[in-house]
């Protein structure tokens, strides 16, 4: 009997009816009674296979493949963020994909870091309900991911070098059956390196079917002066054309903040970072902290990362969905149209089949500025 465990403390004492399993390098098929069998110099079953080693450039490895019915409850991953000073965007070069049942195109496709709300090839602390990133580069996802027939998670190494060590675990439960009205988890990454003036950036489009939108991650690199966050978030639902059904009041409002997140420090206005269960602004930097070069400093365009989870307030649709955000700023002369560098991950659930995603841009085009 299917019983999702995502009910909080209120239902934790109720009997659970799933069969718990885990896939990692120690038990790559999640088999019952076969975890931790690999030997090390310490002896049998003593940490003999803690990770995947030396993933070759261009290789795609299957992290997990399991038969259903079942539901993934948790994914944990950690990996170094660079292999050399010149090859320092591992989190943008690794691509994670997920497939449900018999589909041939992925329902999830994203650079690894961005999927976990860590854009720009850099990690940051994320403290939210469905995503948590903890020291040091401990990436955790708690979105439930049900599947009726089977599930597959792959990792493609588009990095220039071998990945020396990749640690991971996929925790899931098997069930006798799933409800007929179950929907499937999806996530898609996009980027415009320079947005078009007076044209809203598209976070998600082409979605057909019934489902609900559950989250947004945005990695914004500002390329112009002054305040950047007046753009409104728009949800075009079930046939909306020129105008959306839902339109917000500004970017900082969509992420739960107000008045430019500002405070005064030593006579200067600075933006405040924050993490909450359902929305956050966990990352700001105008420096490349991973480099030290004798010929140039570490300055780079300002980078900001935001998340918003529609868990308590899902955006429901019966037929189709499109999600966009404006690029509008404000300066001394009032509102103005901006052109910035915007990347995003959209998270949603929907019935299958789903439309294939547009091809992922090249790794060089994914790199931060």
PLM features: what roles do these ranges have?
Residues 1-369:
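Beta-strand-centric surfaces of beta-sandwich/beta-rich domains
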């Amino acid at each position: 009997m299917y019983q999702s465990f995502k009910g909080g403390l209120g239902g934790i004492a109720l009997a659970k009816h799933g069969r718990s399993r885990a896939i990692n390098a120690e038990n790559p098929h999640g088999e019952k009674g076969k975890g931790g069998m690999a030997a090390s110099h310490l002896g049998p079953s003593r940490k003999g296979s803690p990770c995947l080693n030396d993933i070759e450039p261009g290789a795609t490895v299957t992290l997990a493949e399991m038969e259903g019915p079942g539901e993934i409850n948790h994914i944990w991953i950690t990996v170094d963020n660079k292999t050399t000073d010149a090859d320092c965007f591992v989190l943008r070069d690794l691509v994670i994909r997920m497939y449900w049942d018999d589909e041939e195109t992925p329902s999830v496709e994203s650079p690894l870091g961005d999927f976990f709300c860590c854009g720009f090839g850099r990690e940051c602390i994320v403290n939210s309900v469905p995503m948590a990133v903890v020291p040091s580069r401990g990436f955790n996802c708690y979105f439930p991911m049900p599947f009726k027939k089977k599930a597959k998670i792959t990792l493609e190494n588009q990095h220039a070098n071998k990945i020396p060590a990749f640690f991971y675990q996929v925790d899931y439960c098997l069930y006798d059956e799933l409800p007929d009205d179950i929907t499937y988890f999806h996530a898609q990454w996009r980027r415009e390196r320079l947005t078009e003036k007076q044209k809203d950036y598209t976070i998600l489009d082409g979605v057909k079917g019934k489902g609900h939108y559950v989250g947004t991650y945005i990695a914004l690199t500002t390329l112009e002066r002054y305040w950047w966050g007046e753009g409104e978030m728009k949800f075009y639902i079930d046939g909306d054309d020129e105008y959306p059904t839902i339109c917000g009041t500004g970017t900082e409002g969509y992420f739960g903040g107000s008045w430019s997140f500002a405070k005064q420090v030593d006579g200067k206005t600075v933006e405040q970072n924050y993490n909450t269960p359902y929305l956050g602004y966990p990352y700001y930097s105008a420096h490349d902290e991973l480099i030290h070069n004798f010929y140039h400093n570490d300055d780079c365009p300002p980078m900001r990362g935001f998340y918003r989870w529609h868990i308590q307030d899902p955006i429901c649709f019966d037929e189709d969905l499109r999600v966009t955000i404006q690029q509008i700023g404000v300066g001394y002369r009032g509102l103005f149209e901006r052109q910035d560098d915007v990347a995003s991950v959209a998270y949603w659930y929907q019935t299958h089949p789903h439309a294939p995603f547009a091809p992922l841009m090249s790794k060089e085009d994914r790199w931060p500025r």
